[in-house]
């Protein structure tokens, strides 16, 4: 699993002109899944992201987590993160989970996130989404599980 974790001032996901997920101050997480991913990977990723200390404390140090700042969490599935771009001029997606497995993994991630973090929103697996964000910092991390 590959995730792009972004600290945002605000973010939203639109599908066909309708907003389906929106947060203010918090984290936008783009998620790409591999065939080897499991529920254990998802639990580990979610725990790390929610508790990752990337928000500033009163002295300006990155010392607070999403939980500490009571921020929003916006989860967006993005299979293109798994693209193999090493050869040629067209990406290969052979490293990505199948659509069925990817949907199952994303649904599991969303269910777990909603149970452990009240302000959780999401995009829609398989949809053509427009993602809008104001990256805060910018603070962006690439995490692999």
UniProtKB/Swiss-Prot annotation:
UniProt keyword DNA-binding present: no
Stored InterPro entries: Daa-tRNA_deacyls_DTD (IPR003732), DTD-like_sf (IPR023509)
EC number, as in UniProt: 3.1.1.96
Cellular location(s): Cytoplasm
Source superkingdom: Bacteria
Main location, first listed in the record: cytoplasm
Broadest EC class assigned to this enzyme: hydrolase
GO biological process: D-amino acid catabolic process
Any one cellular-component term (Gene Ontology): cytoplasm
The keyword Hydrolase is assigned to this record: yes
Sequence motif Gly-cisPro motif, important for rejection of L-amino acids, residues: 137-138
Record keywords: Cytoplasm, Hydrolase, RNA-binding, tRNA-binding
One MF term in the entry's GO annotations: D-tyrosyl-tRNA(Tyr) deacylase activity
Catalytic activity: glycyl-tRNA(Ala) + H2O = tRNA(Ala) + glycine + H(+); a D-aminoacyl-tRNA + H2O = a tRNA + a D-alpha-amino acid + H(+)
Family from the record: Belongs to the DTD family.
HAMAP family xrefs: Deacylase_Dtd
The protein's role, per its UniProt record: An aminoacyl-tRNA editing enzyme that deacylates mischarged D-aminoacyl-tRNAs. Also deacylates mischarged glycyl-tRNA(Ala), protecting cells against glycine mischarging by AlaRS. Acts via tRNA-based rather than protein-based catalysis; rejects L-amino acids rather than detecting D-amino acids in the active site. By recycling D-aminoacyl-tRNA to D-amino acids and free tRNA molecules, this enzyme counteracts the toxicity associated with the formation of D-aminoacyl-tRNA entities in vivo and helps enforce protein L-homochirality.
Domain notes: A Gly-cisPro motif from one monomer fits into the active site of the other monomer to allow specific chiral rejection of L-amino acids.
Subunit structure: Homodimer.
Entry protein name: D-aminoacyl-tRNA deacylase
